[in-house]
Amino acid sequence: MSMAVETFGFFMATVGLLMLGVTLPNSYWRVSTVHGNVITTNTIFENLWFSCATDSLGVYNCWEFPSMLALSGYIQACRALMITAILLGFLGLLLGIAGLRCTNIGGLELSRKAKLAATAGALHILAGICGMVAISWYAFNITRDFFDPLYPGTKYELGPALYLGWSASLISILGGLCLCSACCCGSDEDPAASARRPYQAPVSVMPVATSDQEGDSSFGKYGRNAYV
């Protein structure tokens, strides 16, 4: 049962990592509909790297942000958190492949495989937390500006990439928790643990010779012809 949970957790963590990788370059982190000028610009959508605008004919133009230092602090932090989440998830994926019990890489014992699987699970949990913090922080700034009546700039709404990122972070955390469960039961099911115990020779108690046995042995020593 634990092997099935471990394999399922690895599958969930892999899916979460792939979804995080799709979320990062997605263009629809925030979307805004501009009602004032429907001839030239209809919709503006942005992500962490660039901004795009579509006109009424369906033609869109994209441009990257001009300077990283000129960006808001939360956008720079979200970039760093998302990249960190993907790197942690990728490292956890490599350790998870080596730590699964259904794989045979390097001839590792089950106890060591359990430790590798638990480490991979912890990395996936950290990756999910980093992604969750980045996306929630970005969404908080969108909603704060949207409900601020004194905000002079363009107001945006939550884009579909944020919902994808929230789902990816949650899946990564759940997959990491399933992988961490292997650390608890991996050592108990290790058949090689008993083989590593030191050898103990069996203790046998020698019987003490009685007087009758001594008499028989002395009689047998002289033989029958000695008394004839």
Swiss-Prot record:
Keyword Membrane attributed: yes
MF annotations from Gene Ontology: identical protein binding; paracellular tight junction channel activity; structural molecule activity
Catalytic activity: Na(+)(in) = Na(+)(out); K(+)(in) = K(+)(out); Cs(+)(in) = Cs(+)(out); Rb(+)(in) = Rb(+)(out)
UniProt site (Important for the formation of tight-junction strand-like structures): M68
PTM-bearing positions, type Phosphoserine: S111, S211, S218
GO terms (BP aspect): bicellular tight junction assembly; calcium-independent cell-cell adhesion via plasma membrane cell-adhesion molecules; cell adhesion; monoatomic ion transport; paracellular transport; regulation of intestinal D-glucose absorption; regulation of intestinal lipid absorption
Tissue: Detected in colon (at protein level).
Result after altering E46K: No effect on charge selectivity for paracellular ion transport
Keywords: Cell junction, Cell membrane, Disulfide bond, Ion transport, Lipoprotein, Membrane, Palmitate, Phosphoprotein, Tight junction, Transmembrane, Transmembrane helix, Transport
Function: Forms paracellular channels: polymerizes in tight junction strands with cation- and water-selective channels through the strands, conveying epithelial permeability in a process known as paracellular tight junction permeability. In intestinal epithelium, allows for sodium and water fluxes from the peritoneal side to the lumen of the intestine to regulate nutrient absorption and intestinal morphogenesis.
Identification of the protein by name: Claudin-15
Native source organism of the sequence: Homo sapiens (Human)
Gene: CLDN15
